Amino acid sequence: MTRRALISVSDKTGIEAFARALVERGWELLSTGGTLAALRAAGIPATAVSDVTGFPEILDGRVKTLHPAIHGGILARREEGHLAQLAEHGLDLIDLVCVNLYPFRETVARGATFEEAIENIDIGGPAMIRAAAKNHAGVLVLVDPADYGLAFQDEVSQTDRRRLAAKAFRHTSDYDAAISTYLAGADEAGETLPEHLTLDLSRIAAVRYGENPHQPGAIYRLGTERGPVLDARLLSGKPMSFNNYADADAAWALAQELAAQEDQPPGTRAVCVAVKHANPCGVAVADSVQAAWEQARDADTLSVFGGVVAVSRPVDLAAAQSMRGTFLEVLIAPDVTPEAVAWFAAKKPDLRVLVADTAAHPGTLDVRPLAGGFAVQRRDTRPWDDLCPEVVTVRPPTEQEWGDLRFAWAVVKHARSNAVVLAKNGVTVGLGAGAVSRIWAAERAVQNAGERARGAVLASEAFFPFDDVVRLAAEAGVTAVLQPGGAKRDPEVIAAANELGLSMVFTGSRHFRH
């Protein structure tokens, strides 16, 4: 009996070679639309599905394969009763279904209109895939070009058939999830989140383990989103670890926020961010990558050891060589010159040197795991220009203090709460992050700064419940303070700042980070 294969694919990778090999082995091919045209153009004989169903494609191609002559041939079990019914109705078996779906994700990712997105919702394809996967004991279902070779085995094991069926159902499940997520968010104004949210995750990288050696780990992509770190190119060094991904993502996010804020016009200033355990430990803005790196390193030479560094401009040989004496895990940049890559490969072969995907932008959702669920929020992407800073003290900040306050505000946004940052001349001089009380965060930042606190500014991501931070800052030599305001004791805090001659600014915007 002649075996029949139904082929209808949007991703035509390898399809001509696959179809030709099937024909050479005596298979009869059925096909539709663009796939049929491509096969015939390549000189590969194929029968139109409409010739099998006796019914033409209708509704601009919306209905092609939804017919008993197709689904009966796919769903029939290879047993007497079903075969008799097929014979009674003049239908033939279909032994292989090779289908992948309309490119819905790609369509919406490129900014298609709602109407275009709707037209790229595949109906017949998922129906055929699900039918073949259900009847995988008798029908080979192929949704991935990497699996085409299995069709040429003398006998495909039930284990492989079951694996292919699982992949097929995962394919349609992911597809439906992408559509559901798109439709749920299509009318969202951004103020609320959908009632139902499907996370469409695909593993894209294996790592040796998670945060710790006893924890398995992997890296996943959410839907069709691209990420600057997720899709970065590794130019040199060891494979990325779980913690490397997390730290590089944190470092790059802060570097880009500061670059957008400080680098005006673009290309005139360089930002360097050093991160340890997702917290910034040294940040600087300077006229070159080398200068920015050296100032960020010197901000906390102890903590930067074993850190992850992100820079906002390409790394040249001079910048690379200036990193000679510091052990780093990862360096991520918008580009790295060939000379710098060669130097890193020779002198720092373990350092992971990444070029970020600068065209990629993170999605709007921030998803945190909970036992039994997730906490979901919009990402905190509020820019400085969205604030309405209010000077609440007698003395306003100087021009230099305003620049440093804005810089420190961006850094403290990216530190774990409770967080306090001291900065001077575009460089962090003291950071206190992850503290369980605000005064402890301030004490850590002041201790970290030492004498460098004199003439520095201080930024906090949340309000001061008491005036203790202001008094500590003044004693250390800090001259200006920025915080959201909104505490019950704001009048006491303002009075203390005035008493001590500090300038203080309220932003009205809190930036907790957990």
UniProtKB/Swiss-Prot annotation:
One of its GO terms (biological process) is 'de novo' IMP biosynthetic process. Pathway: Purine metabolism; IMP biosynthesis via de novo pathway; 5-formamido-1-(5-phospho-D-ribosyl)imidazole-4-carboxamide from 5-amino-1-(5-phospho-D-ribosyl)imidazole-4-carboxamide (10-formyl THF route): step 1/1; Purine metabolism; IMP biosynthesis via de novo pathway; IMP from 5-formamido-1-(5-phospho-D-ribosyl)imidazole-4-carboxamide: step 1/1. Residues 1-143 form the MGS-like domain. GO terms for cellular component: cytosol. GO terms for molecular function: IMP cyclohydrolase activity; phosphoribosylaminoimidazolecarboxamide formyltransferase activity. Pfam families: AICARFT_IMPCHas (PF01808), MGS (PF02142). CDD domains: IMPCH (cd01421). Disulfide bonds: none annotated. Its EC number is 2.1.2.3, 3.5.4.10. InterPro entries: AICAR_Tfase_dup_dom_sf, Cytidine_deaminase-like, MGS-like_dom, MGS-like_dom_sf, PurH-like. It catalyses: (6R)-10-formyltetrahydrofolate + 5-amino-1-(5-phospho-beta-D-ribosyl)imidazole-4-carboxamide = 5-formamido-1-(5-phospho-D-ribosyl)imidazole-4-carboxamide + (6S)-5,6,7,8-tetrahydrofolate; IMP + H2O = 5-formamido-1-(5-phospho-D-ribosyl)imidazole-4-carboxamide. The IMP cyclohydrolase activity resides in the N-terminal region. Belongs to the PurH family. This is Bifunctional purine biosynthesis protein PurH. The lineage of its organism: Bacteria, Thermotogati, Deinococcota, Deinococci, Deinococcales.
